Amino acid sequence: MIGRVDVKAWGKVVVLMGGYSAEREISLKSGTAVLQSLLRQGIEAHGIDVDKGVLTQLSKGQFTRAFIALHGRGGEDGVIQGVLETLNLPYTGSGVLGSALTMDKLRSKRLWRGMDLPTADFSVLTRDTNPALIAADLGLPLIVKPAREGSSLGMMKVESIEALQSAYREAVIFDTAVFAERWLPGAEYTAAILADRVLPLIRLETPRVFYDFEAKYHANTTRYFCPCGLSEKQEQDLQALALEAFQALGASGWGRVDLRCDEKAHPYLLEINTVPGMTDHSLVPMAAQAAGIEFDEMVLQILASSLERRMFQDGT
């Protein structure tokens, strides 16, 4: 389908990147990679480092569609999607609702649990929480997470009751909503989704405590396995679970679902990223390559979701 679309059909594309979230550095790298790909393929594309003047820039830019490469708050939480909806400017990825729900790990877990989809036991933390009760309920070790932050920022594994309060104080720097989750000691997998197709799974291994910001973007010690080492049936089951979880939260277009197994190799859903990284360390390009999809083709497939949104808006 992509090969039959004339370059002019894409119109004038704006790549939105940067922004003000804690993931700004990664977003700039992702956006630059996407912008270079579009230009390389002869598409008229322009990059915008999103700030308070973005509304004016978008209004005056005469753009025909937007490629969202913003990570974290402002980019994956429905905010920029709402702006683009208001401007009637088609954009890539999930809509307002799907973006807002998937950005919030707590609400994601509650919805999954309501649909009988597996996610690890958890408990909301506040400054008045009794650490001993949390430890008794979830067991130790556990992991503390900000509800609405990406790239594992603010997350900490907790081995003792005493460490729980300090982990909470660290997490609350990133978000007022914080929760503790049962630690899953098994293998970690990620499922990239492209146009409702789940790409080959990637198994992640890191010598660090978990797959944190350093392991994701800077460390050379992180190992990626694709094929992931599961049997064909096991991989298909995980892919089906990932797609069901993705669609259950209203996500669409493209994204990434992260899963981790317990000590018995039972899989649990961790979170969904609706604007995954597109850097040289990123997982979606890696999975796409394993599926025989080169980076430039993948960028066009993602951009194609904006064409579908345009058709929907036009009622054609």
From Swiss-Prot:
Gene responsible for this protein: ddl
Function: Cell wall formation.
Entry EC number(s): 6.3.2.4
Annotated pathway: Cell wall biogenesis; peptidoglycan biosynthesis
Gene3D superfamilies noted in UniProt: 3.40.50.20, ATP-grasp fold, A domain, ATP-grasp fold, B domain
Organism for this UniProt entry: Nitrosococcus oceani (strain ATCC 19707 / BCRC 17464 / JCM 30415 / NCIMB 11848 / C-107)
The organism's place on the tree of life at top rank: Bacteria
Class of the enzyme per the UniProt entry, highest EC level: ligase
Catalysed reactions listed for this entry: 2 D-alanine + ATP = D-alanyl-D-alanine + ADP + phosphate + H(+)
Protein name stated in the entry: D-alanine--D-alanine ligase
Residues given in the record as Mg(2+) 2 binding sites: E271, N273
One Gene Ontology molecular-function label: D-alanine-D-alanine ligase activity
Cellular component, GO annotation: cytosol
GO term, biological process aspect, one: peptidoglycan biosynthetic process
